[in-house]
A protein has these predicted regions:
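Short, structured motif recognition centered on aromatic/hydrophobic residues
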Residues: 7, 34-36, 76, 84, ...
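Small/aliphatic-rich secondary-structure junction motif
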Residues: 1-60, 85-87
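Gly/Ser-rich helix-loop-strand patches that form or flank binding pockets
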Residues: 4, 13, 107-157
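A short acidic, glycine-rich active-site loop
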Residues: 57-75
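Structural beta-alpha unit
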Residues: 24, 79-117, 154-157
Length: 157
């Protein structure tokens, strides 16, 4: 029995496809809790900030900017969580500001007693994999918790 399953989500359809696999785990036996995690990387729009006239500073309220991203993440996770309501599955949501999603995911898993991480992978190979990197692959290599990778092919059912 898994006591706590961590499901990192990035807002993509592929990431949400993992939810079907999590629900299947419940069919095979009881699971204590599912944690839906969104690691929010807040990128400051430097290009837009530098678009002002020469010599004029553009005011930027980082806290308001961050709050917008974090609120958007919380609303997104609440919508995803609602899909589990009829299943009788205990679900918790976490929105965490992140400099690197893979590290945030592995740190959260280690600090919070996670038994399994279920994460989607884009399935890139070759040059595309080298250029784009893979959060899922980094999680797989950095985590001391078992990781279930869900490839795109597993979503086309």
């Amino acid at each position: 029995m898994y006591k706590k399953i961590l499901v990192p989500l990035d807002g993509s359809e592929l990431a949400e496809c993992t939810l079907n696999h999590v629900k299947k785990l419940f069919q095979d036996g009881p699971v204590g809790e599912v944690v839906l995690l969104n690691a929010v990387v807040i990128e400051i729009p430097w290009r837009e900030l530098n678009a002002g006239d020469e010599g004029h500073a553009i005011r930027f309220d980082y806290n308001a900017f961050k709050k917008t991203f974090m609120d958007k993440s919380r609303k997104y996770l609440a919508r995803v969580k609602s899909r589990f309501s009829s299943e009788g599955i205990k679900v918790k949501t976490e929105t965490i500001e992140s400099n690197g999603p893979s590290q945030t995911i592995t740190d959260y898993a280690q600090k919070n007693g996670v038994d399994l991480i279920v994460i989607a992978t884009h399935g890139y190979t070759g040059m595309k994999k080298m250029m784009l990197g893979s959060i899922a692959l980094k999680v797989l290599h950095e985590s001391n918790v078992p990781v279930l990778l869900v490839r795109p092919e597993a979503c086309r059912v």
